[in-house]
């Protein structure tokens, strides 16, 4: 172990308990200088050779002068303690003598006055000795002046513990004897009371003989009471007497740290003062001792112990320098009062950090591939115990790759790199104390690589909006394939792309395509930086779908006495092939629904006659070979109309010689004036199986008409209605026009019924 030791305000140094060295400032001692400094202090070595030691001699002499007074005071306290012990012994002897005489007195050989006088005098002597012993004990427990015994005498510091320990031992012996005397006295008083009962004692029976010695018994009782009082005082004094020296509490919050700088390790220890009754213990009598020794990892000492004493209680830190790196040491801090009384302390084991390595040497390139290279190096000259190497590979873009490897290795290959890319390589070594500087940089460029084309590209599935492709991987090359890219287009003027990041995946589904549309596909293998050669083109057509809804739907109500609706529209945005039909579903809300098919080339439709003052629902569909698409839905409410009832309507079917079938319709006179009549008729083969046809008769007095029909055996439905024209023909038409969000409103057409 190296022996550089630095302690702030070092007062005493005990290498293996072979002496003391005192100073008042920073002390640095190494190896043989310890013995040389000791010789200088003893006067055997010239002080001129050791100027620092000479300064310490002068300081030690000055402090020794101040300490002589403390020695004298300590001697006086010691004498007081000894005197107290002697008095206590005398009191004990007096008690013992009184007890002997008391025994003789009880036998009638000693006068009673002398017996009680010996007892009282012995008790008072013990009490006085106890008071002296207490003063001596307190002086030895916390000696304010006697603490500074001669630390520096004629240039050398001598131990000042033997005198104090002797005093404490003597005091402890005296206190033990004192306790025995008090117990003996109390026992003797109790026995004497039992011999001479008094009226104050329970179960006492008076007798003539007792009354004969009344004066004597009162005298005995009074003296026994006096001895009891003195004994109780002795007990009180004995409680306050300490049984021995009381150590101070240990230092608080002891912290030990270590570092290694420039191939040398240091240990730093700090602490807080001990506390007594909530206050820190300080003062000139409070010192600290730091115990330091090399140890193993379990805290067991493996070398000699060094003890350092810090005289100034205001300094609560110390350092031990120039130690071996990566080594274990034990540190313990204790507080001392008056040099002889020392607190308990807990030993702390600390391991000094290892050396910080120097940079690795001779970094060089061993070989390259498109996605890898290998490097080698020499270990650092200063390395201690290495924990790992760290290799840094930085691209031109600044992106860095870091790899940590085993410290036993001196070469390594980095993989998964970009092809055709320059990297800057550095390496650093680490111990458990930190990382070395990085080595000199080495520039390395990986080989270039272009992948071959994927093989056997094919479409394995499709639907309305997607196509699924599959292919075989390219033939192996020197580099790594990172994934694939699929380009697809409609007309080669522009293309979309799909990326696959996993090179093991050789199938993909391209989505969000248009139904019934031809697409062209090409697959590429790719690296991190470039595409490889493209595969052959393949074409695939998505499946057809039903058309989307018709666009720009416009509708309006037409009214010439009978209300209708007219609807117009534009073809769907996506027809997915030719439109076969347009289909309209319509009817009174809550009633039967009619279905009409329209030719794909006519983009308008006029409804049959509508019910007055009723809601009608409409749905318009487009249809192709796949099926019927989504509808456009809308609703219309017709206007209210006055109802003119025509009574007695009769229908008669007649067939002429030429096989012409006609319906003769007659009716009665309405109750209100009319301008004419409407006669409506249609075939009745089911609900809404045919459209209404009508005849307008603009004669208010007409009472019948004839309708020619083409189908002889088909039933017909006939309705007769009266109507009254409006006074202003220009307002005869009432129309409503509607459109839908995103659709254009068509222009209003003229009313064909006016």
UniProtKB/Swiss-Prot annotation:
Segment forming the signal sequence: 1-19
Subcellular localization: Secreted
One Gene Ontology cellular component: extracellular region
UniProt-listed Pfam families: fn3
Region (Disordered) residue spans: 40-61, 85-106, 130-163, 731-754
Keyword Iron: no
Domain annotation Fibronectin type-III: ranges: 250-355, 359-449, 453-545, 549-642, 645-742
Principal location: secreted
SMART domains: FN3 (SM00060)
Tissue spec: Prismatic layer of shell (at protein level). Expressed primarily in the mantle with highest level in the outer epithelium of the mantle edge and lower level in the mantle pallium.
Biased composition (Low complexity): 130-161
Keywords: Repeat, Secreted, Signal
Designated name of the protein: Fibronectin type III domain-containing protein 1
UniProt source species: Margaritifera margaritifera (Freshwater pearl mussel)
Organism lineage string: Eukaryota, Metazoa, Spiralia, Lophotrochozoa, Mollusca
């Amino acid at each position: 172990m190296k022996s550089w030791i630095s302690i702030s305000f070092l007062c005493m140094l005990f290498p293996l308990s072979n002496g003391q060295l005192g100073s008042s400032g920073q002390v640095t001692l190494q190896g043989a200088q310890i013995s040389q400094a000791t010789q200088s202090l003893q006067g055997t070595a010239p002080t001129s050779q050791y100027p620092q030691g000479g300064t310490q001699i002068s300081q030690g002499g000055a402090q020794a002068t101040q300490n002589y007074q403390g020695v004298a005071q300590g001697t006086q306290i010691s004498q007081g303690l000894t005197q107290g012990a002697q008095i206590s012994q005398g009191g004990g002897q007096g008690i013992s003598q009184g007890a002997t005489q008391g025994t003789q007195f009880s036998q009638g050989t000693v006068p009673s006055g002398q017996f009680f006088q010996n007892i009282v005098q012995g008790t008072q002597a013990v009490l006085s000795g106890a008071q002296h012993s207490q003063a001596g004990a307190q002086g030895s427990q916390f000696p304010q002046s006697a603490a500074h015994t001669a630390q520096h005498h004629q240039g050398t510091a001598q131990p000042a513990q033997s005198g104090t320990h002797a005093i404490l031992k003597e005091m402890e012996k005296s206190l033990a004897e004192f306790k025995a005397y008090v117990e003996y006295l109390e026992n003797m008083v109790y026995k004497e009371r039992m011999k001479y009962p008094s009226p104050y004692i329970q179960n006492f029976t008076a007798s003539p003989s007792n009354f004969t010695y009344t004066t004597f018994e009162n005298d005995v009782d009074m003296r026994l009471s006096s001895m009891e009082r003195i004994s109780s005082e002795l007990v009180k004094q004995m409680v306050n007497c300490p049984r021995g020296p009381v150590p101070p509490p240990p230092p608080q919050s002891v912290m030990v740290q270590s570092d290694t700088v420039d191939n040398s390790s240091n240990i730093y220890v700090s602490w807080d003062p001990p506390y007594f009754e909530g206050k820190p213990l300080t003062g000139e009598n409070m010192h600290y001792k730091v115990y330091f020794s090399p140890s193993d990892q379990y805290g067991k000492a493996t070398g000699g112990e060094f003890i350092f004493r810090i005289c100034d209680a205001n300094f609560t830190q110390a350092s031990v320098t120039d130690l071996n790196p990566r080594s274990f040491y034990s540190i313990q801090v204790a507080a001392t009062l008056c040099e002889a009384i020392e607190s308990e302390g807990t030993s702390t084991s600390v391991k000094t950090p290892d050396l910080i390595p120097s940079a690795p040497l001779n970094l060089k390139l061993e070989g390259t591939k498109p996605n890898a290279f290998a490097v080698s190096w020499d270990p650092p000259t200063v390395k201690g115990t290495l924990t790992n190497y760290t290799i840094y590979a930085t691209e031109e873009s600044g992106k860095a790759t870091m790899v940590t490897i085993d410290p036993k290795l001196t070469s390594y290959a980095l993989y998964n790199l970009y092809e055709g890319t320059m990297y800057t390589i550095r390496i650093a070594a680490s111990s458990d104390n930190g990382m070395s500087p990085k080595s000199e940089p080495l520039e390395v460029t990986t080989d270039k690589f272009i992948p071959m084309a994927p093989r056997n590209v094919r479409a394995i599935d499709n639907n309305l909006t997607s196509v699924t492709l599959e292919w075989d991987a390219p033939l192996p090359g020197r580099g790594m394939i990172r994934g694939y890219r699929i380009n697809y287009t409609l007309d080669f003027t522009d293309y979309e792309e799909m990326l696959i990041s996993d090179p093991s995946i050789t199938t993909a589904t391209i989505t969000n395509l248009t139904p019934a549309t031809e697409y062209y596909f090409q697959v590429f293998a790719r690296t991190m930086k470039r595409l490889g050669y493209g595969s052959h083109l393949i074409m695939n057509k998505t499946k057809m779908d039903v058309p989307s809804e018709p666009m720009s739907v416009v509708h309006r109500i037409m009214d010439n006495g009978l209300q209708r609706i007219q609807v117009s529209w534009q073809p769907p945005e996506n027809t997915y092939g030719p439109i076969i039909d347009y289909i309209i579903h319509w009817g009174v809300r809550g009633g039967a629904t009619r279905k009409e098919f329209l030719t794909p080339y006519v983009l308008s439709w006029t409804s049959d006659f509508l019910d007055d003052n009723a809601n009608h629902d409409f749905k318009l569909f487009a249809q192709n070979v796949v099926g019927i698409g989504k509808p456009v839905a809308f609703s219309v409410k017709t206007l209210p109309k006055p109802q003119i009832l025509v009574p007695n309507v009769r229908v008669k079917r007649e067939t002429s010689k030429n096989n012409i079938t006609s319906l003769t319709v007659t009716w009665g006179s309405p109750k209100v004036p009319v301008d004419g009549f409407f006669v409506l008729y249609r075939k009745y083969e089911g609900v809404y199986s045919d459209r209404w046809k009508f005849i307008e008769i603009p004669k208010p007095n007409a009472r019948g008409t004839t309708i020619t029909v083409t189908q002889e055996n088909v039933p017909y439905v006939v309705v007769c209605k009266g109507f009254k024209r409006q006074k202003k023909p220009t307002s005869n038409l009432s129309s409503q026009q509607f459109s839908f969000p995103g659709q254009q409103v068509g222009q209003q057409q003229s009313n064909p019924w006016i």
